[in-house]
Amino acid sequence: GLWSTIKQKGKEAAIAAAKAAGQAALNAASEAL
């Protein structure tokens, strides 16, 4: 149903945000070195 679709989209968005944050952290670390 609609609610499961919303939850799935939220989960995907959270995963994408976590990946982006991790990549940003790696970039910042490599800049600092």
Curated annotation (Swiss-Prot):
The modification Leucine amide is found at residue 33. One of its GO terms (cellular component) is extracellular region. It is found in: Secreted. Keywords: Amidation, Amphibian defense peptide, Antibiotic, Antimicrobial, Secreted. The keyword Nucleotide-binding does not apply. It holds the Pfam family DD_K. InterPro entries: Dermaseptin_dom. Expressed by the skin glands. GO terms for biological process: defense response to bacterium. Its main location: secreted. The keyword Secreted applies. Belongs to the frog skin active peptide (FSAP) family. Dermaseptin subfamily. Has antimicrobial activity. This is Dermaseptin-H9.
